[in-house]
Design a protein with these regions (language model features):
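Short solvent-exposed beta->alpha transition segments
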Residues: 30-31, 45-91, 106
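Short, low-complexity N-terminal intrinsically disordered segments enriched in polar/charged residues
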Residues: 15-42, 50
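Structured segments of extracytoplasmic/periplasmic soluble domains
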Residues: 35-43, 51-55, 101, 120-123
């Protein structure tokens, strides 16, 4: 009887945890952030769109086509400066320094970009990005 109570408590609490969505934390977020930036750097916009929240994917791809980014946008460098996980582990803020050129301008631009990621459907997805070459394109 003495073992039965702790065992039942363990089963009940363990079952509750199994139904609570758990993010992968920073270990799961970092590769997503790196791969997203590599894909936009090498103009793999369709591959990069897989890291966006579903409601932003088509808008993002349409904007790339309309702006001829496969031809006119060159992301010359990026550096992830900071990654902060929200206390609940389901949201994250990523700060990146990005450098790019968009023709016809011959000037390289640099911006500190803040991106918001959300853990949804067992994956980290980019929800918002301010500044940078895609400023104003996320709802």
């Amino acid at each position: 009887m003495r073992l039965l109570v702790p065992l039942l408590l363990l089963v009940v609490l363990g079952g509750a945890c199994a139904h609570t969505p758990q993010s992968t934390g920073l270990e799961g977020l970092r590769p997503v952030v790196e791969d997203f930036h590599q894909r936009i750097r090498w103009k793999d916009f369709r591959g990069a769109a897989r890291y966006l929240v579903p409601e932003s994917r088509e808008v993002f791809l349409r904007a790339r086509a309309e702006r001829h980014d496969d031809r006119d946008l060159s992301i010359t460098d990026f550096e992830v400066l900071d990654v902060q996980l929200a206390p609940d582990g389901m949201r994250a803020t990523v700060v990146t320094r990005m450098q790019w050129m968009r023709l016809p301008s011959p000037s390289e631009q640099t911006a500190t970009v803040t991106s918001e990621y959300v853990f949804r459907d067992k994956a980290w997805l980019l929800e918002r990005m301010d500044e940078g070459p895609f400023a104003g394109e996320f709802p």
